Structures are given as C-alpha cells and as structure tokens.
Curated annotation (Swiss-Prot):
UniProt gene name: rpoA
Organism expressing this protein natively: Fusobacterium nucleatum subsp. nucleatum (strain ATCC 25586 / DSM 15643 / BCRC 10681 / CIP 101130 / JCM 8532 / KCTC 2640 / LMG 13131 / VPI 4355)
Record-given protein name: DNA-directed RNA polymerase subunit alpha
One term of GO molecular function: protein dimerization activity
Biological-process GO terms, alphabetical: DNA-templated transcription
Membrane spanning stretches: none
Region feature (Alpha N-terminal domain (alpha-NTD)): 1-230
NCBIfam families for this protein: PRK05182.1-2, PRK05182.2-5, rpoA
Amino acid sequence: MLKIEKQAKAIKITEVKESNYKGQFIVEPLYRGYGNTLGNALRRVLLSSIPGAAIKGMRIEGVLSEFTVMDGVKEAVTEIILNVKEIVVKAESSGERRMSLSIKGPKVVKAADIVADIGLEIVNPEQVICTVTTDRTLDIEFIVDTGEGFVVSEEIDKKDWPVDYIAVDAIYTPIRKVSYEIQDTMFGRMTDFDKLTLNVETDGSIEIRDALSYAVELLKLHLDPFLEIGNKMENLRDDIEEMIEEPMDIQVIDDKSHDMKIEELDLTVRSFNCLKKAGIEEVSQLASLSLNELLKIKNLGKKSLDEILEKMKDLGYDLEKNGSPE
C-alpha cells in the first residue's frame, strides 16, 4: 500500500453541530493540498447542486401583475413577492405542487396561514407575507416546484400558466452558507498535513449531514467514470508495493558523489531526459527525492525508475527506503 493510501485510511471526520442545520465538519489529516482540493469541490457542489423546493409562481385574486395596487393591504405587490421568496418549503418528492391561503382581515398574514398539499411542509411558518388593514378577503395560490440552485423569474417557463399568475425567483438550494478553512495538523510525527474545517448552514429543510452526504455522492458519480480509463496506476502500484518500507536506515556514502552531475550516472537517454526535464541536475537533488516523488516525474516509466534506483544504490543511496541518506 502506498504511503498516501495509508494516510487516507487514517482520515477522521468530526462533526461540531450548533443545530441540525448549522455546524462544522473537521476533516484530518489530509495530504498537503488536499484540504483545498476537497474543500473547494464540496463547497461548489453544496452551493450549486443540492436539490430543494421553492415557490416559483403565485396568483393573488384580483391582481394581474406585480404593479397592481391592492386596496386594504399595507405592502405593495412587489414587496409581497419578496416576502414570499423567503418562505422555505420542504417537499417529500419531486414535481410541481400547489398551496393556497384564504383569509379575512384585518390580519398579519404569515406562512402559517398557507394550506399545503400532502407532502409539502412550511419550514418557517412565522415568515410574514403581508398585512391586511381592512376587513377585505385575500386569496393567494402558490406553485411549488423542486430543482437545484437559483432560477430568476424571467427564466421560469410560464407558457401553460393562466395570465394572472406571477413568476417568483425560485431559490431551490437549501444551502444558506458554505465556507472552509485550512490549517496545519500532525500525522504521526509529521506536521505538514492539512486540517479542513467545512462550515455549513442550511435553510432548515435539510440537515447539514444529509446535504454533505449528498454532495459527496454527486462528486463520486462524476468521478466513477474515470476509474474505467485504465489500470496502469494499479499495475505500477503492485510492482512497487513491496519496495516501500516505513523504517529508514542510515546509509554510508562517498561525500564526492553528492556533488556529481546526473550526466556522470551514465543513464540511458530516456532516463536522463526525464530527469533533466524535471529540473534535476545533480545527484544531491535526486537523492533528496522520495520514491513517490520519483513516480510523479512525467514520462518516467518502470524501466527508467529501476535504472535510476540501481545507479543511486551503487553510490550508496537507497531511494527504495523513501528518503535520502544522512
């Protein structure tokens, strides 16, 4: 097993919750750089791709557009629409549904006054919709749909709607905030590892752990096809697995070899060119590389790797021990 794989098996996740809908996930230890890689990927997926429900249209009895003036109602229609956008809806299944309210004033109309279809739930019933100041009646119908992200009212398909329905900006994403921080952490005696702290807050329609789990599943679905590309890395890993050992022995070398140029190693042209293109000019540079770092050199194949290891061993350097001599 490669060193990075051993380290990956040691990763732990700690959940620090303020509530079911707000908290932190602390992930450590991560290989250097993986904190940003995972943090950025998870943040983008959480913000863009977690499905949710939202009101995308509404009909107010007697109102033909958002610019209509309503008698006996304190707020303008445009303000009512803004308030309706803040209503958080939870849906048990996907698809378009209906909700409605019918009240008689005077009254402060809230989301709690809405009668929802089976399978729909109002998460924030205290959200104010409008204030009716007279004894007039107010009837409103709502269209609820499911989706991802945010869809502005101009992009909502209204071709099958009655003329008096008004489109509403649909905030489908249940994620309110996502941020992440990277700090140094230890793994064994090494301190150059990442600790990822992922801060997540939802609108209350989904728990943070469910949102994160779904984001990971989405990422996995998009990465799975890459596993079919080939098994070259798997074969290479099998070839070198037995060569990697944890203990590092102290080796005795000739001090003069440390200042040698790689030209003096008498390598084949392919091996020499790979090292030169990687910016390796001297034996001292080569001696400082671990086996994993050698494997990352572009176009360096198994035969070239074996040749370099053998040449360095002749000089007293055993790079198979994953380090350079003291």
